[in-house]
Amino acid sequence: MKTLLLTLVVVTILCLDFGHTVTCHKTDVFTKTCISPICYEKITSAFIIERGCGCPETSRKVKVRCCMTDKCNR
């Protein structure tokens, strides 16, 4: 009985998301679960060139849009 209870606790911990992660798009199809609570997309000349976790700095030619909800960088 203790083994069953321990197994249920472990499965619950692994399945629950305690709000410390966010799911970000890497491409149109693929996503990644990130520890950082921020997603970004880099845009240049009206084309999205990169997506991922975190919030990198912008430059004159590259605009970066950062957001903080699941799959918000689409």
Swiss-Prot record:
Expressed by the venom gland. Its main location: secreted. Gene3D superfamilies: CD59 (2.10.60.10). It is found in: Secreted. Disulfide bonds join C24-C39, C34-C53, C55-C66, C67-C72. Residues 1-21 form the signal peptide. GO terms for molecular function: toxin activity. Keywords: Disulfide bond, Secreted, Signal, Toxin. InterPro entries: Snake_toxin-like_sf (IPR045860), Snake_toxin_con_site (IPR018354), Toxin_cobra-type (IPR054131). SUPFAM superfamilies: Snake toxin-like. One of its GO terms (cellular component) is extracellular region. Belongs to the three-finger toxin family. Short-chain subfamily. This is Three-finger toxin MALT0065C. It comes from Micrurus altirostris (Uruguayan coral snake). The lineage of its organism: Eukaryota, Metazoa, Chordata, Craniata, Vertebrata.
